[in-house]
Amino acid sequence: MPETWKDIAAEILHLYPSGARLVGVAGVDAARSRRAADDLGAALTAAGQTVERAHTDDGDEDALRADVITPFRADRSDRVLVVSGPPAVLSTSARGLWNYSVWQLAGDEKPHTAASALVQLDDPDRPFRRFADFCALPASFGA
């Protein structure tokens, strides 16, 4: 398991050690978000957490709240829900749903500055964490 996911799992557990914790994983490519969320879920499981997974293809916030978030929050037991999907998962109105958020990207995709962590996934087997250093933006950002 890549150290990047272990480190992010450790960070989540340091910040939110118990209770019902919600993690959103999003990016331009929703399928890549699914893989990233699966890998993060595996790291959280390896760290001794009970993990639940959900994925949304369209990021419909109302459906996500009604069908996934509200039922999860109804039971406050110690576990982590990792939800993956398109950029809408971390939209301005949806950001408050998550205790922690991950924006995955590849190539010159633009970073999402409101995410808790940015993970570069040019090679999903070798992810690495990026930090929002706006002095070093990719060319596609217009820098």
Label for each model-derived stretch:
Residues 1-22:
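Extreme N-terminal, non-catalytic leader segments
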Residues 23, 52-54, 99-104, 116-120:
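Hydrophobic/aromatic beta-strand patches that form the interior of the parallel beta-sheet core
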Residues 23-42:
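Glycine-rich phosphate-binding P-loop
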Residues 26-30, 56-59, 83-87, 105-106:
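Structural motif
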Residues 41-60:
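Short beta-strand-centered segment that lines the nucleotide-binding/catalytic pocket of NTP-utilizing
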Residues 59-70:
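Conserved nucleotide-cofactor-binding alpha/beta core module
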Residues 69-114:
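ATP-dependent NMP and nucleoside kinases share a basic, alpha-helical "lid"
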Residues 110-143:
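C-terminal functional extensions of proteins
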